[in-house]
Amino acid sequence: MPSNFIHPTAIVASDVELGENNSIGPYSVVGGMGCKVSIGSNNYFGAYNLIGSPAEFATGCPIEAMLEFEDWSATNPSQVSGVKIGDYNVLRDRVSVDAGISRDTTISNNCYLHSNCLINHDCNLSDNVVFAPGVISAGTCSFGKHSQIGMNAVLHQGLKVGAFVMVGMNATVTREIPDFALSFGSPSKTVGVNRVRLLRLGVPRDDVDSANDYLLGLTEALPSSVLNLLK
C-alpha cells in the first residue's frame, strides 16, 4: 500500500484490496470481521468512516423470520458478502457502508457521499451518484447513474431510484422513482421531470416538456434525446 495515504489512527484490515492513490482519514475502519472489501484507485475517505461492517445477531435470534436471503448464516462469517468501491469516489466524514448479505454493497465510480450518510447492505450506486449530508438508504436499494439525493432523505429498503433523478431534502422515499424524475415530500412523490438537470445536459426545452408529460402519465413515450442519456 505504499502509494496510498492511511492516517495513523485509521484501521485497514490486512485482506482489504486497495488500489493506488487512495486517502483514508483519521479513525476510519475499513474491512475486518470476515468482510471482503475491494477499493479501486483515487478515492478519498474522510474521518470516522466505517466501510464493511457486517450485520450482527445475538445468540438465538430468529433471523429466518426477518431475512429473505437463503445463504445467510449468523455463525459463518464467510457467507457475508463484501463491499466494492470503484475509482474517484469521495466519502466525506462519518459515512457508513455496510457489507452485503446476498451480494456486495457497491459504489461505482465518481460518486460523492457527503458527511453522515448511511448505506445499508446490498445497495448499489451507479456512476456519478451524489448523496447530500445525512442521507440514509436502507438495504438492497439501487441508484441509477447521475442520481442526486437531497439532505436527510430516507429511503425504504429494496427501492430502485432511476438515473438522472433528483430527490428533495427531507424526503421519505417509500416507492420506486423512475428515470429523470423530480421527487420530494413525505412520503415522496414524483412531481415531474428533473428539468434543470436535463436542460443543463443540453436536452431541447420542448423535449424536456415532453419528458415531463411522460412522467405525469400524459404521453406514452420519452423523446429520443432523453432516452439517449441512458446509453
Model-found features: residue ranges?
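N-terminal segments that cap or nucleate solenoid repeat domains
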Residues: 1-27, 33
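Glycine-rich hexapeptide-repeat left-handed beta-helix
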Residues: 2-5, 29-36, 44-81, 93-96, ...
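Conserved short hydrophobic patches within well-ordered secondary structure
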Residues: 12-16, 112-114, 164
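Surface-exposed loop/turn motifs in large extracellular/passenger domains
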Residues: 15-18, 35-39, 78-85
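A general structural signal for short secondary-structure junctions and capping/turn motifs
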Residues: 40-41, 86-87, 174
